[in-house]
């Protein structure tokens, strides 16, 4: 779903808080992972702020980067927390189980305002995930439509999808 943010999956959650460029760098890389960074207004801007989950939570809670390891996990890294999304294939080809885990330092519950900070953080992340799932359902419907042009290539904005497909093919054809 990270590859499709340009389609407006997160117009209510992430989009208003991202830097005005609203673009994500997908570095050329090999291997079973992808990494997203939002560089801000310019390429040389501080890459350590994706500007979410919510500006009012402060920079110490903003995600620095998202790393996805194919095919089963995604990490959202920030100075004070890590979000771990574990994906387990489900009983059907089009179903899977998603578990969200939030990791904080051992003494985090002793911080002033911990509950007031992490409750909206969880609500924000889980809301964005719901938007992802709705968007992916729409993409799946599009993919299965008789009107879909299956000969069209990926947009440069979908570089991670192409990278994932290359990785799958490499793994399936490895001897």
Give a label for each model feature.
Residues 1-175:
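C-terminal catalytic domain of Rieske-type non-heme iron oxygenases
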